[in-house]
UniProtKB/Swiss-Prot annotation:
GO CC annotations on file: extracellular region
Signal peptide start-end: 1-23
Record has RNA-binding as a keyword: no
Keywords in alphabetical order: Lipoprotein, Secreted, Signal
Entries under Pfam families matching the protein: Lipoprotein_11 (PF03260)
Listed name of the protein: Low molecular mass lipoprotein PBMHPC-23
Location of the protein in the cell: Secreted
Recorded family membership: Belongs to the 30 kDa lipoprotein family.
Origin superkingdom: Eukaryota
Annotated source species: Bombyx mori (Silk moth)
Note: This lipoprotein belongs to the group of structurally related '30 kDa proteins' that comprise major protein components of the fifth (and last) instar larvae and of pupae.
Record InterPro entries: Lipoprotein_11, Lipoprotein_11_N
Length: 264
């Protein structure tokens, strides 16, 4: 009895057309993974987002994380900060270092930084004089960008699935806070001070990232009043501008209301 043995030969995909189809398939697959990660962040499912990110990084798919981070910043998503924080405290510090802009790492690590208002290119500081409550008015300094007067660091606080920041001035050991009263320059804008305590939501802030002319910037909002930190239009004899809380929409104007966060 004779048996006919048939061998199946599988040829590798070597033609340009076949290779192109394979690349398109991989690109489509990565796009789906990007959308899944983006949506997890957008819906506040940060634990899932961290798990996905750690998995993609272990598989050599860091480009997925990079693209998602870029899109979050371009789209001005506040959730970018929560995602970054959860990575930072959840074994994902290397991911933050590799795929987030430097200023995110400076914020999360509590490094000394300068907070510079983009519109006037002035660094935030606290004034040298105090009121009866030992509070100091916050200004944008007309000259200084190098001394301890303009040195700050951020202290993180996680609450109700959100990350907030206490903004600590290292020169005077005081915390940035928003006043309950408005300034005389505008009846709607609130005065911003440095104070000794940080036990209320007036001393807590949240950030919204943005991109403008290839720069990564931040809108800085007070938690209690939801007002954005800005510098006023009035200039004093030293070239300083008073810091106030802007009562109005700012997200559409990063060229005017946003801040650089840079190493000190």
């Amino acid at each position: 009895m004779k048996f006919l043995v048939v061998f199946a030969v599988v040829r590798a995909c070597v033609t340009p057309a076949c290779a192109e189809m394979s690349a398109v398939s991989m690109s489509s697959s990565n796009k789906e993974l990007e959308e899944k990660l983006y949506n997890s962040i957008l819906t506040g499912d940060y634990d899932s987002a961290v798990r996905q990110s750690l998995e993609y990084e272990s598989q050599g798919k860091g480009s997925i994380i990079q693209n998602v981070v870029n899109n979050l910043i371009i789209d001005k998503r506040r959730n970018t900060m929560e995602y970054c924080y959860k990575l930072w405290v959840g074994n994902g510090q290397e991911i933050v270092r590799k795929y987030f802009p430097l200023n995110f790492r400076l914020i999360m690590a509590g490094n000394y930084v300068k907070i510079i208002y983009r519109n006037y290119n002035l660094a935030l500081k606290l004034g040298s004089t105090t009121n009866p409550s030992n509070e100091r008015i916050a200004y944008g300094d007309g000259v200084d960008k190098h001394t301890e007067l303009v040195s700050w660091k951020f202290i993180t606080l996680w609450e109700n699935n959100r990350v907030y920041f206490k903004i600590h001035n290292t020169k005077y050991n005081q915390y940035l806070k928003m006043s309950t009263t408005t300034c005389n320059c505008n009846s709607r804008d609130r005065v911003v001070y440095g104070g000794n305590s940080a036990d209320s939501t007036r001393e807590q802030w949240f950030f919204q990232p943005a991109k403008y002319e290839n720069d990564v910037l931040f809108f800085i909002y007070n938690r209690q009043f939801n007002d954005a930190l800005e510098l006023g239009t009035i200039v004093n004899a030293s070239g300083d501008r008073k810091a106030v809380g802007h009562d109005g929409e700012v997200a559409g104007l990063p060229d005017i209301y946003s801040w650089f966060i840079t190493p000190f």
